[in-house]
């Protein structure tokens, strides 16, 4: 399987896509490809990616959406402690019960909560966020506070009852994009980002701050990966239970 940004299929009028397909077919593989949105597979995030599945045993179709109603940011993170900038610790107790089926799924087999630590933002960033109402964006900032970032999505807050925009490797920077908490004056924590990526809470991320951001932000969302794996298993006549083993 190959995963990349959706623009790969159209870049250079499709030249890169054609080169990939032709090269892999010369190796004896049948190739199928499609743009999949992780939000269609239970991930609380709009994340469109080009997916290639390659097989020596016939062309494998890509999965169809597995849900009828999308998982929201509220579904994903509302049960997590409402930390302010600089608060939290690497390991802590849960302080509330799960409030959605998704939260129950994320907490399955997890006794403790990890990686829920808020960035220690500079005071100037916190003051900017205080000017932005819940679930809104930089349009509420005075022009002189817009900074050098030209994109409209910078300084944006997530919306509780919608899917998140695509999580990237700078999700903990308040100015980076629409990755600030819906109403708290901070960017999302690594655990909140992991939940939005569909990593359940038994995944513990270790290493430097930069390395943790890369682990979370560059990953294929596990629920999307599972849907693809289930489709491959079905192609080979395996049921889901066998696939999970």
Positions of PLM-derived features:
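Class I S-adenosyl-L-methionine
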Residues: 1-145
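C-terminal target-recognition/interaction regions appended to catalytic cores
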Residues: 101-245
């Amino acid at each position: 399987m190959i995963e990349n940004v959706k623009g790969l299929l159209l870049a250079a009028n499709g030249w890169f896509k054609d080169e990939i397909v032709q090269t892999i077919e010369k190796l004896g593989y049948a190739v199928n490809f499609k743009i999949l949105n992780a939000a269609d597979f239970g991930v609380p995030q709009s994340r469109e990616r080009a997916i290639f599945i390659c097989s020596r045993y016939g062309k494998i179709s890509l999965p169809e959406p597995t849900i009828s109603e999308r998982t929201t940011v509220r579904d994903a993170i509302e049960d997590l402690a409402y930390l302010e900038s600089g608060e939290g610790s690497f390991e802590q107790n849960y302080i509330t019960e799960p409030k959605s089926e998704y939260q129950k799924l994320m907490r399955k087999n997890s006794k403790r909560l990890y990686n829920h630590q808020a960035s220690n933002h500079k005071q100037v960033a916190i003051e900017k966020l205080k000017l932005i109402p819940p679930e809104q964006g930089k349009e509420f900032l005075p022009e002189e506070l817009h900074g050098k970032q030209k994109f409209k999505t910078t300084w944006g807050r997530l919306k509780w009852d919608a899917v998140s925009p695509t999580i990237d490797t700078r999700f903990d920077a308040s100015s980076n994009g629409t990755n600030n908490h819906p109403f708290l004056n901070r960017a999302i924590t690594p655990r909140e980002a992991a939940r939005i990526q569909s990593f359940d809470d038994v995944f513990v991320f270790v290493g430097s701050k930069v390395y943790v951001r890369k682990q979370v932000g560059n990953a294929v969302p596990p629920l999307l990966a599972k849907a693809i794996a289930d489709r491959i298993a079905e192609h080979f006549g395996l049921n889901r239970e066998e696939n999970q083993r």
